[in-house]
Amino acid sequence: MIDTIIIGKGAAGITAAIYLKRYNKNVLVIGKDLGALEKTVKIENYYGFPTGIDGKELIQNGITQAKHLGIDVYDEEVVQIDNTLEYFLVTTPNHEYKAKTVLIATGKKRSPINVKGFKHLQGKGISFCVTCD
């Protein structure tokens, strides 16, 4: 049985997995996309990247680090979670997993707006960043 299944393979999910693994927990990460960080064009205020890094590359680096630590990261969609007295049963279209705990790290979806030019200007003046906005 898995100690913790993390649903969501964005920055929060992968970071949680890395920390749990450091505490010798058996961890599995399941998710379909890379979260909001994937759409970030350039991160220039993060330690260790003097010329910046794009969000997709940063999250891929995190996934690589997690896999290097022995964490399985699956590209699947969770369709159901059941709780028995003994464990959680997490179901995807192709698998069922048993875990002692489940951590939901699916993030917050950005609400699209229907404004001409909006998509084209994302990352080029329109941003979703607390310190940028």
Summary of predicted features, one role per range:
Residues 22-25, 67-72, 104:
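Generic secondary-structure signature for well-ordered alpha-helical cores
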Residues 19-20, 66, 88, 122:
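Generic detector of bulky aromatic hydrophobic side chains
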